[in-house]
Amino acid sequence: MVKKEKKANVSGKPKHSLDANRADGKKKTTETRSKSTVNRLKMYKTRPKRNAGGKILSNEYQSKELPNSRIAPDRRWFGNTRVVNQKELEYFREELQTKMSSNYNVILKERKLPMSLLTDNKKQSRVHLLDMEPFQDAFGRKTKRKRPKLVASDYEALVKKAAESQDAFEEKNGAGPSGEGGEEEDGFRDLVRHTMFEKGQSKRIWGELYKVIDSSDVIVQVIDARDPQGTRCHHLEKTLKEHHKHKHMILLLNKCDLVPAWATKGWLRVLSKEYPTLAFHASVNKSFGKGSLLSVLRQFARLKSDKQAISVGFVGYPNVGKSSVINTLRTKNVCKVAPIPGETKVWQYITLTKRIFLIDCPGVVYQSRDTETDIVLKGVVRVTNLEDASEHIGEVLRRVKKEHLQRAYKIKDWEDDHDFLLQLCKSSGKLLKGGEPDLMTGAKMILHDWQRGRIPFFVPPPKLDNVASESEVIVPGIDKEAIADNSQAAAALKAIAGIMSTQQQKDVPVQRDFYDEKDLKDDKKAKESTETDAENGTDAEEDEDAVSEDGVESDSDADEDAVSENDEEDESDSAE
C-alpha cells in the first residue's frame, strides 16, 4: 500500500500551539500570537519529554534519576559520638566554675561542650512532700509520724526565721546602687509620683533594651564618671549573668574630664575587679580612650572569629553619653545628641567597620528607691518639665563644695538654699514684675549647669586594700597560665588584658580651671583610698595632675589613624 502524503499547510495558518505565528483562537482576526502568550503557554507545559522508547529526555521540575537511599553499614551512625566518664566530667565542671567566676574569661567553642551536664540546675523551690513523707506514713494504720515537723519550735525561733528571710529577700531584691553605702531609709516612700519621674521605665523602652541585648555580642554599659555606682544598672548585669552568659560586657567611664585624674584611676581599679573597664571622654575632635576602646572591640571580633561580624550595643542611663560615644568612634555625627535626656527614641544600627556594627539604645532606668531629687540629679528628667525646681537645690548645695559654688556663681556666703537662690536671681537679673526674684528660673539654671557638667561634683572611689606590685599592674580575672598559649583566642585575651593595664597608667584629661589645686592633687583621705594601688616607682603628684592638651591631641591623632580605614571601607554612614 502506498501511504498518503500529508498535505502541506499552505493556508498560512500554522497549527502548532507554540508557534508564535499562530492566530489567537479567541479572536476572529488574523492577528498572530505575541511572544508573551507563547511563553505563557510554554510555562503550562510541564510534562516530561520522552523518546520513542519511553526514556525521559528532559524535564525541568523533576530529577532524571532517583538517588540511592541505602545507608552505608557504618557503626559510626549508631555508636556514641563522645564519651566521658564521671571523674572527667566533675573535674571539668569544677574548672568551668572556677574560670567563669571572672568576667575576663571567655568560653571558646561553647557549642561543642555538654553545657547541660556541666551546669547545675537550680534548686526547685517547691517541696515534694509526698516524696519525703507519703500519706501512708502520716495518716492511717501505718502511721509513723509521732509529732509534726515545724519550721520553728517556739515563737522566738519563728521571729528569728522570719527576720532572716526578710533580710535575704531585701538583699536579693534590693534597690541596688542607691541603697549601697547611702543614707538609711526613714520607713516612708512616695505613694504617688508624677509620671515624669518614671521616664526610662516604660514597656516600650525596656523592649528597645532587650532588642539591643538580643542583637548584640558585646554590650558596653556607659556610666557617668561623676557617679559610677549611681548610674549602673545592676538588674541588667544580673540578667546577663543568668540568661546571656555568652555575651560580654564592658564598663565605659564616660565624662572622665569632669572629675580629677586620681578619682578616675581609683574607679578604674575598683570597677576592673568586676568587668573590663575603660575611661572615656566623648569628643569628635579631642577624645580620650578612643584607641583603647577600638582595640578592645577588635580583640572581641577576633574572639568571635566564627562570625562574619559582631554587634556592639551601648546601654545605660539617660544622658550619660551613649550617642556621643558612637559619634566619637565614627568621627562624625551619625547619631542625634543633645544635653537633655530622652533624645534617642529607638535603637539604630551604625556601621563602624566591615566586622563591627554599633547599636545605639535609648536610656533605660531601673526602678529603685531613689527619691525624686536623686532622679533629677542623675539627669533622668528634663529640667524644663519640673513644676517646682527649687525643692531640689538644697541637695545640690549639700553635694557640691562651697568653694566651687562661690567660684561658679560669684556668691560669697548664704544661709540656706532659699537665700542662695535670692542672691543668684539678683546677681543674674532674673526678676519678675516689681523686682521680685524669679526663684523658678534661678533653680532651673542651677539644675541645667548640674546636668551639663558646669558644676564640679564627683563621688570619690572607695578604699582598696590590695597593693599592686612594682613591676606591673595586675588586671584581675586574667590568668597568665591560661593566656600563655599562642592561639588566636589566647592572643586576643592577652591583648585585652594589656589594654586594661595600660589605660590605668595613662594620664586622664581634666578641664582646666574646673577644680582647684587641692582637688586635683587630692587630700590625705583620698590619697589613702587610691594610692594603695599606685605604682611605687611613680610620683603621686605626676599621676594625679591633669594631663596637658598635647597628651590629648596625641591620643586623638592615634585614634584618627586607627579608624581612617573605616571611612574608606564604609561609604554608608547612616543608620540602617
UniProtKB/Swiss-Prot annotation:
CDD domains in the record: NGP_1
Region (G4): 254-257
InterPro entries per record: G_CP_dom (IPR030378), GNL2_CP_dom (IPR024929), GTP-bd (IPR006073), GTP-bd_ortho_bundle_sf (IPR023179), NOG2_N_dom (IPR012971), P-loop_NTPase (IPR027417), TRAFAC_YlqF/YawG_RiboMat (IPR050755)
Bias (Acidic residues) ranges: 531-576
Chain segments carrying region G3: 360-363
Region (Disordered), start-end ranges: 1-61, 166-186, 502-576
Domain CP-type G: from-to ranges: 206-367
Listed Basic and acidic residues bias regions: 16-34, 509-530
UniProtKB keywords: GTP-binding, Hydrolase, Nucleotide-binding, Nucleus
Localisation per UniProt entry: Nucleus, Nucleolus; Nucleus
G1 as annotated region, ranges: 316-323
Top-rank taxon: Eukaryota
Compositionally biased residues, Basic residues: 42-52
Ranges where the record places region G2: 342-346
SUPFAM superfamilies: P-loop containing nucleoside triphosphate hydrolases
Stored PROSITE patterns: G_CP
Region (G5): 283-285
GO aspect biological process, one term: ribosome biogenesis
Domain notes: In contrast to other GTP-binding proteins, this family is characterized by a circular permutation of the GTPase motifs described by a G4-G1-G3 pattern. The DARXP motif is also sometime designated as G6 region.
Protein name (database record): Nuclear/nucleolar GTPase 2
Originating organism: Arabidopsis thaliana
